[in-house]
Amino acid sequence: MQIPFHTVGLVGKYDNQGMEASVRALAEFLRGRGHAVVLACQTAEHFGITDFPTRNLHDLATESDAVVVLGGDGTMLSIARELSAHGVPLIGINQGRLGFLTDITVDHMYDAVDEILSGQYVAEERILLKGQILRGGERVFEATAFNDVVVGKGGSGRLIDLEIAIDGEFVYSQRADGLVVTTPTGTTAYALSAGGPIVHPTLEAVALVPICPHTLSARPIVVSGRSRIELHLTYADDARVHFDGQHHFDLQSGDHVWITRANRPITLLHPHSYSYYDTLRQKLHWGKKL
């Protein structure tokens, strides 16, 4: 049985041209279709929208049956991390560039959102990662990632020496520009550029993709999504760990980065006609003459 969607939350990217018109129009459309519409406080304040109730993100997730995110993939990454603990499903309207996560175009948003909220949808559960940095045995930083956790070099441009263990078992050491630890969702992001595999987003798996390793034998590996991945920085003159490219923490030699699956997945809702492979063909231009 499909879940009912009475209350719908709206979140819009603030600095996107045309976003105000899209947020207003979609809110009016949903209200006209009988839904209770709630806007994120910052979205409403930024655009000066006063004729709809507003909530902070925590309360928005708690009170909404679904949340529509208008923006690009970066906006969806940020909102997904914020709301993942609440279990509210997300619908993505693309007003960015790529649109792997926000797969519905503005031109089709009325029909697509109406279709989803009427119960005709494809639901995907996607895992997130939790990363912790330990220094001298004490936790000094932690964050979550929807796409990836990336250990990379900083401004000095020097290589990083890493030892990698999975579930307490040593796997290998590497000297490289860094390492991408990615969810299946993130395999079409930075990991793809680093030569990693494309993993179907509903799989419970994690890929480890070296960035410019100083060896000819290094290859990406895919492990269980329930694995505990431990990265030990044996030498790091200038290194950082990045979470979805939106949060970072400076690392030192001797630091340990522990990465596990986050406690709760995020659920994305797509129109009934959605196809992941069609998205790959469109976004990666498969089969087109270059």
UniProtKB/Swiss-Prot annotation:
Gene symbol of the encoding locus: nadK
Functional summary from the UniProt entry: Involved in the regulation of the intracellular balance of NAD and NADP, and is a key enzyme in the biosynthesis of NADP. Catalyzes specifically the phosphorylation on 2'-hydroxyl of the adenosine moiety of NAD to yield NADP.
Taxonomic superkingdom: Bacteria
Catalytic activity: NAD(+) + ATP = ADP + NADP(+) + H(+)
Protein name: NAD kinase
InterPro entries in the record: ATP-NAD_kinase_N (IPR017438), ATP-NAD_kinase_PpnK-typ_C (IPR017437), NAD/diacylglycerol_kinase_sf (IPR016064), NADK (IPR002504)
Pfam family, any one: NAD_kinase
First-tier enzyme category under EC: transferase
GO biological process terms held by the UniProt record: NAD metabolic process; NADP biosynthetic process
Keyword Coiled coil among UniProt keywords: no
EC annotation from Swiss-Prot or TrEMBL: 2.7.1.23
Cofactor or coenzyme needed: a divalent metal cation
Primary localization class, coarse: cytoplasm
GO molecular function, one term: NAD+ kinase activity
Keyword Kinase: yes
Family (UniProt): Belongs to the NAD kinase family.
Record-listed NAD(+) binding positions: 73-74, 147-148, 158, 175, 177, 188-193, 246
Active-site annotation: 73
Keyword annotations: ATP-binding, Cytoplasm, Kinase, NAD, NADP, Nucleotide-binding, Transferase
GO-annotated cellular components: cytoplasm
Location(s) in or outside the cell: Cytoplasm
